């Protein structure tokens, strides 16, 4: 365990403890490693909360979150974990690069400060100036997970990508993603025993869309294209570049 970045696991353990739920730390760590949620450099954002979900809790994830999102979650007694650049949280730390390298639990929010549980800080519970918290949180695109009390609290929050422009040369990629998504879906259905039928029949496992992508009705093609379109825009929204190699 020496040198291993397990801050996310400890944040999830903190929540299990706060909710008076039984846990075994070594088992949780072993599970996270075995399922590749815990990597040598730490837990990726997209795996944050997986141990809680694996333990039967309902975990909702969101990019571009706001302080109001955190405030509302705390008010209804939900737990909040955020991804941050740890060195930006503390004035005495040397911040050598901009990156998301840490997870903390937000336990209280005031007008000028944020109280957090930081598993790598003494004491574990610290009050951070609001400006420092926002600076550190911004590195993860304001990523947070919220641990719900029940599934009834779940509200979908797709990332808004309306303001992301796409170059015309990405149309080929958009169409390729759309057609591939259809092929992936069709292959999975066929492996489950589904066949083509003029109308959907769940008992007979017949589906009218089990045809080549080119034979799909325009409405279904548009659904796949919109998914591809939003996927490409999401990639750009989160700071990734799409580069086409020659050859």
Q: Can you describe what each PLM-predicted range is?
A:
Residues 62-119:
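Active-site-adjacent substructure of cysteine-protease-like catalytic cores
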Residues 1-64, 76, 151-153:
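Cysteine-nucleophile protease catalytic domains, especially the papain-like/related folds used
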Residues 154-247:
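Alpha-helical propensity feature that highlights long, continuous alpha-helices across diverse contexts
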Residues 29, 71, 134-135, 222:
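Generic structural signal for individual residues within well-ordered alpha-helical segments
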Residues 58, 79, 241:
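Residue-level detector of anion-binding/catalytic polar loops
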Residues 37-41, 91-93, 97-98, 107-153:
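Noncatalytic regulatory segments and standalone regulatory/sensor domains
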